[in-house]
Amino acid sequence: MPWIQLRIDTDGPHADAISDQLMEEGSLSITFEDGKDSPIYEPTLGETPLWNHTVIIALFEANFDLSPVVERLKQLPCLGENFSYKIEQVEDKDWEREWMDNFHPIKFGDRLWICPSWREIPDPTAVNVILDPGLAFGTGTHPTTALCLEWLDGLDYSNKDVIDFGCGSGILAVAALKLGAERVTGIDIDYQAIEASKANAERNGVQDKLELYLPEDQPADLLADILVANILAGPLRELAPLIAEKVKPGGLLALSGLLQEQAEEVSAFYSQWFDMDEPAHKDDWSRLTGVRK
């Protein structure tokens, strides 16, 4: 069946109050969108911030009369008589199919492909990782994941052990194993991420070479020839001594999840343990690499 949606322009501080009003008016669902392409990075613990310019999208049944709803919304002090809104008809679609159509095989470097399970593999002779969007972050579409995958594609894995620090979906761990790593250890604070990594390793037939741990369960003497950490700038700074002690002398490091303006500071911080390279950039994001002293 078709639907009707009401789009309202507002700001972050008032979005929740307007959302509550719309639910009372009979909205079937509420969605918040960024109105001006201003993403939010590293919210504090327990915080769910919204954008300064937030678009609220309220969905109603097609025969719903929105005129009285709009009139009542005008009485809200945070909106007023001349608030900006738009009413649109929304056609009924196979939303699951439309969502799936947005994901395609992606190539990273010279030999690595990340392929959704419902797509045909473009190059059966390449290194192919089968991975679907799911519970944990990391499908290759984000610039930080792409930067890490491109770096992993260019490495020699002969007799090498790898640590994926903050493994999320397991995409980097599985890619390293498919590229030839001897063994990979994945560490994450989220049990759901551990389960997602395990499932993706099994799907790609590399589960026997992947060990997964919550931080409190990891071996005390864990060391690697290669460590990749795609998290955020704050945790990268806080965990730097712990990360450094897990890399063997002469071992390789890659850090991502940080913005370009954060790269210089984080690189300087890690330089006490590593000989750091020049950053690599993609869109607004950066990757740092280095060699353990």
UniProtKB/Swiss-Prot annotation:
Main location: cytoplasm
Protein's UniProt keywords contain Transferase: yes
The enzyme's E.C. designation: 2.1.1.-
GO MF annotation list: protein-lysine N-methyltransferase activity
Domain of life, source organism: Bacteria
Catalytic activity: L-lysyl-[protein] + 3 S-adenosyl-L-methionine = N(6),N(6),N(6)-trimethyl-L-lysyl-[protein] + 3 S-adenosyl-L-homocysteine + 3 H(+)
GO terms, biological process: methylation
Gene Ontology CC annotations of this record: cytosol
Record has Transport as a keyword: no
Enzyme class: transferase
Disulfide bridge partners, by residue number: none
Keywords annotated in UniProt: Cytoplasm, Methyltransferase, S-adenosyl-L-methionine, Transferase
Places the protein is found: Cytoplasm
Pfam family, one: PrmA
UniProt xrefs under NCBIfam families: prmA (TIGR00406)
HAMAP family: Methyltr_PrmA (MF_00735)
Designated name of the protein: Ribosomal protein L11 methyltransferase
Organism whose genome encodes this protein: Shewanella halifaxensis (strain HAW-EB4)
Gene encoding the protein: prmA
